[in-house]
Amino acid sequence: MLDKNQLEKYNQEHLYEYEKLMSSNEKNALDEKVDQLNLAEIQDLYQDLYVNRKTIDDVSSVSEVKYEVKSRLNEEERHTYEQKGYEAIRNGEFAVLLMAGGQGTRLGYKGPKGSFEIEGTSLFELQARQLIRLKEETGHTINWYIMTSDINHKDTIEYFKQHKYFNYDANHIHFFKQDNIVALSEEGKLVLNRDGHIMETPNGNGGVFKSLKKAGYLDKMQQDHVKYIFLNNIDNVLVKVLDPLFAGFTVTQSKDITSKTIQPKDSESVGRLVNVDCKDTVLEYSELDTDIANQFNNANIGIHAFKLGFITSAVDRELPYHLAIKQLKQLDENFGVVERPTLKFELFYFDIFRYGTSFVTLQVPREEEFSPLKNKEGKDSVHTATEDLKRMDLI
């Protein structure tokens, strides 16, 4: 039985009323779930991230990151980086980590976003092709770690099976799930999903490293003598997966964190890679005043290489949550299905940067390496992604 006094203390007394409409099994399931939750922490999250939320307007401690521009590298520098990259890949120094926990909902597609196809080629296949090419060029089969979520894990694995893993060695593809966290109403109340369970949503890409560890894959990387983890996400159709030049740049620089960026456009709604108090980090566009965002020259595109030693030392350290507000379907007080603004709490992978001690960035040409697929129509859409893939002769 739910503790009514405890629920009232943390603004969750509506759950007591919900129980009156539930069967015995449903009540037991709700009781068990609520017992597992730290209601005080949930209330603190709500207060800190929603009630008292603010944007960043004091940039006195924020400066530009240390970066090099790819287009300014001479032929000798490019060749040297590429050769070092091929050598490191051949020697098994890199693992590839793909964040692919999302669905294709905003594309008008039911299924894992990575399985969305553009003229017959899925986002997963676009990346698998590049790993196959690296295998042909180096003789080494790179381990490919793919983070899914509860909402797409089974479908993702099934899609890979149906497509015979895109002719990549299935023994070198490793799937694991990110964790979840509860969602709240704008009043700070726990909500029920359409099945009558406490609604939980994926806890953001910042959980990637802990989930990787929980699955045993950080240990595997150490056993495989991996030195660097190349990280990217599923959204960017022009991503160069572990391109040898960037791999060589990473090895040569030998920093905890090596990043790729692009030159941002004014008022572009993309996070900025900046240096805060002598550490690189990403400030989300939603957390910055527009005039402040326009002061910085490196837009984050979610492509990085991390020293494995750094990740293993920092993986268990705490990261802050960030707020996202989404329209999600849920049960109302009469158990009818409604769609309402819902607070999602997300961890961001780049918050682990705060535990690093050395950083470097390579700014790359937007037109060659960045074309996000986010919408069905308009900006960053299926149309723009298709045009960019054709322009780069990728489909």
Curated annotation (Swiss-Prot):
UniProt entry tagged with the keyword Transferase: yes
Major enzyme class: transferase
GO molecular function: uridylyltransferase activity
Keywords, alphabetical: Nucleotidyltransferase, Transferase
Listed EC numbers: 2.7.7.-
Source organism superkingdom: Bacteria
Keyword Transferase: yes
Amino-acid positions noted as binding UTP in the UniProt annotation, renumbered to this chain: M99, A100, G101, G102, K113, Q178, G204, D235, K344
Pfam families for this protein: UDPGP (PF01704)
Protein family membership: Belongs to the UDPGP type 1 family.
Name this polypeptide is given: Probable uridylyltransferase SERP1770
